[in-house]
């Protein structure tokens, strides 16, 4: 278990930073390229542990994939060309891989077994396996398909109209991917609109997708045609440096090529509402996945209330938003964020416990947290508990804490941002 020592940053963070490729889009580009007909070239791919797990799984099913840094070539097999894996498909720490891939495996007429690490073994799979079973897939697992390992024998599926109890892009995507070979029109309705990378990329690969309010539909029998994919920077990774730029004194950062998909930009809306000083310069208007350069500098923040429809648009950014709130004047309330409990860790409890160790005044609620600003943080020994977003949040916290901060299990950041600590170091010079 590797640890990192973070010293206070007295001179601020300054400079330009190119944000690594979006994790969600990188996963989908590999998967969709694998089931498309023809060769797909992906540029800007995120070579983090999670996305490499996706490559490994599809290679195991006979797909020819060559990865060289942030460029990947996938020679697609078509929807019917995947081969039965000879070994267990290991997704590592990647919830996206197991949930989306389950939708693809549900419509393949062979047997597969899917598992991941200890964190994946605790994460709820029934939200995906139940609708896939309703479509006709034969899926089993611990506690009737609630937990991994999962066994899947796909086959002839029938379309369903599914009302999802949660706004989850992973649930929605698994059902839509299963629907590609299902008989009829598959429809998914959510309580709030979740991130729409799957819909956008399916359309880029030639699939007709219909969107009506909170409902997404597609007809079975459609084929994917290979296309080249340019992956923008991951706004969830950018969030750590956006908050760092706002709360570390004497800072000014330019974040280049940040993905600006409107289903993901809740962090931008929150920082604006809190009073952060920043500018957004669009760089690829008209692209299926918009991007921008963002300049942010040290700001005076104020506490706000965060809840409702915005939560799915910033669910992964809540740990670092909580950190920002510790440096804001007044009280910040985060609610309607039950989904935090089923991430890599229970992020409500973990954020509260670790920030409390650093001297923050923060308390957990059933569906979020309450943060009392402004708090002077003091260095301490903290732990990511294997959660990449907790690890990065704690690193930024260490930059403003008095004295050194020791982060245990710091290597977890490699899941989504392998060069995070190196980038942080560069910006302090």
Swiss-Prot record:
Its main location: cytoplasm. InterPro entries: Enolpyruvate_Tfrase_dom, Enolpyruvate_Tfrase_sf, EPSP_synthase, EPSP_synthase_CS, RNA3'P_cycl/enolpyr_Trfase_a/b. Its EC number is 2.5.1.19. GO terms for cellular component: cytoplasm. The keyword tRNA-binding does not apply. The active site is at residue 316. It is found in: Cytoplasm. It is an enzyme of class 2 (transferase). Catalyzes the transfer of the enolpyruvyl moiety of phosphoenolpyruvate (PEP) to the 5-hydroxyl of shikimate-3-phosphate (S3P) to produce enolpyruvyl shikimate-3-phosphate and inorganic phosphate. HAMAP family: EPSP_synth. NCBIfam families: aroA (TIGR01356). This is 3-phosphoshikimate 1-carboxyvinyltransferase. It comes from Bacillus thuringiensis (strain Al Hakam). The lineage of its organism: Bacteria, Bacillati, Bacillota, Bacilli, Bacillales.
